[in-house]
């Protein structure tokens, strides 16, 4: 850029063609000037050219030759007047010679009226002539430029007597040079040296067509046929009149010098790597080089320079060299480590300032920010209110889940006067959103990921709320969303008291708190704005104050099952019929009475048992006994209200045995259920595995094996996945799987990887399992011996097996010893898993 600028400057300032000489020609000149005879002839030629008499002869011959062509030629010989010194384009020193010649017309004036003020005055017409610019040298042998402007001698005489006319003459000369050569002159720093003329006066020529050519002049030239036809000349050519400026431009007191700012870089190979922060400082230079052109200053002692971290201030009040520059730097620099140098030959001030880059801590923070921007989504939703299954860290490395999640942003409220949605921005409605009601709180979940917390704005009214926010996609391009919600007209007493919006990783949660007098809304109006509304139903309604246990029993007890055992026929009669309201009320009363007893038992169970107590609990068979006891309580209720049975099965007498959702027949073949088993010595199942434990507050289940081939299973209670419209029971085999409504969610820290956290938790679980194996190794062997002994006693005395609490009935009265041993082993494993 600087090279092209210098070439343009040389082409603009150096109009004379450079001497193009070859090496051979230069050698010939060198040999010729070495001869005395050639030097004598050369000096005689120079004296002949500079002789005034010879120049007059030369000019008369040129005039006669041009006259034969019908052109009048006048030679202008400038006579010295005064000299103006200034700067050309703020880079080069130049001189302007104000000279005079008799060949120039006299200045003329006429009376005129000023259109702006209405005052009368004189309007001057000042003829002038210009010569071509030429290169010269100043007193210090520095390169400069010289211009000649020639006026009539009367004009110079008036300038010497009238100060205003002198200034008008100077402005006319400066305007002519700027207009003709397309340059800029420094008018604020004009000097008038004690010179009459700069350089050697050189005549110039003014040509114009002759008014009355002679017959000889009109004769065609002998070689005219060889050239193209000359266009006809106009009748009378008027001289070009340059209009004067009606309003003179104000001359500034100080001149702004010409300057350039260069960015200096070093070659750093680390910028060519594939790291995220490799090209962070590509656009930040190592230093700034500021070059200021001061052609009218001889040294820096004549100016004042002040450099700060963000600006440069230069001031010079020397007469003829008044400069003032205030420059704002594009980067923050270290003003203490900078240096300045003034080139006296080029009259140029160079200032080098190192750029202040960010510290190592700031660069590390920026690198961490870029790393978080580029990280991929782990697919794990973070919720502050959900329970975390991650085990507690004894060292306190894992913080609270609420601290790991990004802080909730407080959305700004837009002013009511300005429009909420900007007309220049395109807004979208979230493609998916849900609404749930909890008492007097409406919760909206807008499924929009990567929402910027600081972009959330809301406009709340009495019965409506307008929300807008923005997201950043993978290409770092913002996408704007808007959501307008309004309460339905059915609930006129409802109003919005407060609103809260929270931005999460994958959605936005909007909570609307309604007034206490409002009813639970069944629907709402939503859209992009108030003009585009659509009615939506509320998906879920939850009431915290209601008795969930009583309602669950009312809803989940639609059937009544009756069992009758015939000792003579060795048959079991099962009757299924829908329950009545009276029976349900009796069940509710019976459940409310032992409610206090159950609370006391739960408090006792919550206490941590001792080592002996844990061994006793292993031997108890609480699972099947509790289920059977509840079914025995229902038998007298079934006898009071007998209805026509739905299905009756006659089964042979079978031995009762404890079953864990499995049915074993006499042949040794077992039907394995879909419910999972797990041991304390193996890894725990995942959260999606089902559990076969009996939920006392919701349902009861039993399994009956008929003839060793059919499996009958019925749930006393409602399971959300079942179709409750069919009250009957199919004769085909049914297996019921019940899932927990509570969803466990894993929470991970932002500053740790998922694989690393998984390995850490697995290692901690392995250590706990090893400790448990060491503590329970001796107790497990004792339990196995006791369990095997009890199984052998049951084989010897089969009559006692009839009092067993299990419900699994097999066809054979006496089973093989192999089956008993396998049952005993399964029993031992079941107790160990508890």
Swiss-Prot record:
Keywords, alphabetical: Cytoplasm, Phosphoprotein
Any Pfam family hit: PIH1_CS
Main localization, broad class: cytoplasm
Chain intervals with Basic and acidic residues compositional bias: 552-571, 785-798
Residue stretches of biased makeup (Basic residues): 608-619, 759-773
Example GO BP: cilium-dependent cell motility
Biased amino acid composition, Low complexity: 597-607
GO annotations of cellular component type: cytoplasm
Location of this chain's protein in the cell: Cytoplasm
Residues found modified as Phosphoserine: 378, 777
GO terms for MF: protein phosphatase 1 binding
InterPro entries associated with the record: Kintoun, PIH1/Kintoun_subfamily, PIH1_N, PIH1D1/2/3_CS-like
Start-end of Acidic residues biased regions: 389-398, 582-596
Record region (Disordered): 214-239, 374-415, 547-669, 759-834
Function: Required for cytoplasmic pre-assembly of axonemal dyneins, thereby playing a central role in motility in cilia and flagella. Involved in pre-assembly of dynein arm complexes in the cytoplasm before intraflagellar transport loads them for the ciliary compartment.
Family: Belongs to the PIH1 family. Kintoun subfamily.
Subunit structure: Interacts with Pp1alpha-96A, Pp1-87B, Pp1-13C and flw.
Name by which UniProt lists this protein: Protein kintoun
Gene: Nop17l
């Amino acid at each position: 850029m600087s090279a092209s600028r210098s070439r343009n400057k040389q082409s603009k300032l150096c109009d004379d063609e450079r001497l193009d000489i070859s090496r051979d020609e230069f050698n010939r000149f060198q040999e010729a000037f070495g001869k005395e005879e050639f030097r004598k002839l050369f000096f005689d030629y120079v004296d002949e050219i500079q002789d005034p008499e010879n120049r007059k002869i030369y000019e008369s011959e040129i005039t006669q030759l041009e006259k034969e062509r019908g052109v009048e030629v006048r030679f202008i010989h400038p006579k010295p007047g005064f000299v103006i010194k200034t700067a050309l384009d703020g880079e080069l020193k130049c001189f302007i010679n104000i000279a005079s010649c008799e060949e120039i017309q006299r200045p003329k004036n006429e009376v005129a009226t000023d259109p702006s003020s209405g005052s009368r005055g004189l309007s001057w017409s000042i003829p002038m002539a210009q010569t071509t610019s030429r290169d010269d040298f100043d007193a210090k042998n520095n390169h400069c430029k010289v211009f000649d402007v020639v006026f009539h001698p009367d004009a110079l005489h008036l300038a010497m007597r009238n100060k205003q006319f002198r200034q008008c003459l100077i402005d006319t000369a400066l305007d002519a040079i700027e207009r003709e050569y397309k340059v800029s002159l420094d008018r604020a720093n004009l000097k008038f040296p004690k010179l009459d003329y700069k350089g050697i006066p050189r005549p110039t020529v003014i040509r114009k067509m002759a008014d009355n050519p002679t017959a000889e002049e009109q004769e065609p030239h002998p070689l005219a046929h060889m050239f193209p036809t000359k266009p006809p000349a106009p009748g009378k050519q008027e001289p070009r009149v340059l209009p004067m400026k009606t309003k003179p431009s104000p001359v500034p007191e100080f001149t702004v010098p010409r300057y350039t700012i260069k960015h200096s870089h070093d070659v750093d190979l680390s910028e060519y790597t594939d790291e995220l922060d490799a090209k962070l400082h590509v656009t930040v230079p190592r230093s700034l080089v500021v070059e200021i052109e001061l052609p009218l200053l001889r040294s820096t002692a004549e100016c004042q320079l002040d450099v700060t971290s963000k600006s440069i201030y230069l001031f010079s009040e020397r007469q003829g060299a008044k400069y003032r520059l205030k420059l704002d730097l594009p980067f923050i620099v270290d003003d203490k480590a900078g240096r300045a140098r003034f080139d006296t030959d080029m009259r140029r001030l160079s200032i080098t300032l190192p750029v202040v880059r960010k510290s190592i801590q700031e660069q590390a923070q920026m690198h961490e920010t870029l790393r978080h921007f580029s990280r991929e989504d782990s697919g794990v939703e973070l919720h502050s209110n959900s329970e975390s299954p991650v085990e507690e860290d004894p060292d306190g490395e894992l913080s609270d889940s609420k601290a790991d999640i990004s802080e909730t942003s407080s959305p700004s409220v837009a002013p009511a006067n300005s429009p909420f949605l900007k007309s220049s921005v395109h807004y979208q409605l979230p493609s998916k959103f849900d609404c749930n009601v909890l008492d007097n709180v409406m919760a909206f979940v807008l499924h929009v990921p990567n929402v910027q917390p600081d972009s959330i704005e809301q406009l709340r009214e009495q019965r409506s709320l307008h929300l807008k926010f923005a997201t950043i996609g993978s290409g770092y391009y913002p996408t704007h969303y808007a959501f307008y919600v309004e309460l339905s007209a059915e609930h006129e007493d409802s109003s919005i008291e407060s609103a809260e919006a929270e931005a999460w990783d994958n959605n936005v949660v909007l909570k609307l708190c309604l007034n206490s007098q409002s009813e639970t809304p069944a629907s709402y109006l939503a859209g992009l704005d108030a003009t585009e509304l659509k009615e939506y139903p509320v998906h879920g309604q939850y009431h915290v104050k209601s008795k969930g246990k009583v309602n669950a029993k009312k809803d989940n007890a639609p059937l009544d099952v009756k069992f009758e055992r015939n000792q003579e026929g060795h048959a079991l009669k099962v009757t299924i019929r829908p329950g009545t309201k009276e029976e349900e009320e009796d069940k509710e009363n019976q459940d409310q009475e032992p409610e206090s007893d159950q609370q006391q038992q739960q408090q006792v169970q919550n206490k941590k048992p001792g080592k002996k107590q844990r061994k006793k609990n292993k031997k108890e068979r609480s699972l099947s006994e509790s289920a059977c006891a509840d079914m025995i309580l229902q038998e007298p209720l079934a006898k009071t209200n007998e209805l026509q049975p739905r299905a009756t099965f006659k089964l042979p007498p079978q031995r009762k045995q404890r079953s864990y959702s499995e049915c074993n027949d006499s042949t040794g073949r077992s039907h394995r259920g879909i419910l999972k088993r797990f041991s304390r010595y193996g890894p725990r199942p995942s959260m999606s595995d089902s559990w076969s434990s009996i939920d006392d507050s919701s349902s009861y289940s039993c399994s009956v094996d008929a003839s060793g081939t059919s499996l009958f299973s019925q749930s006393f209670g409602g399971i959300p996945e079942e179709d409750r419209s069919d009250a009957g029971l199919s004769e085909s085999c049914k297996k019921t799987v019940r899932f927990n409504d509570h969803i466990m969610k894993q929470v991970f820290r932002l500053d740790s990887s998922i694989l690393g956290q998984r390995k850490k938790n697995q290692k901690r679980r392995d250590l706990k399992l090893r400790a448990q194996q060491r503590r329970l190794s001796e107790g497990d062997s004792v339990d196995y011996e006791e369990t095997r002994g009890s199984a052998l006693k049951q084989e010897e005395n089969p009559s006692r097996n009839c009092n067993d609490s299990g419900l699994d009935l097999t066809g054979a009265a006496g089973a093989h010893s192999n089956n008993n041993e396998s049952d005993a082993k399964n029993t031992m494993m079941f107790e160990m898993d508890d």
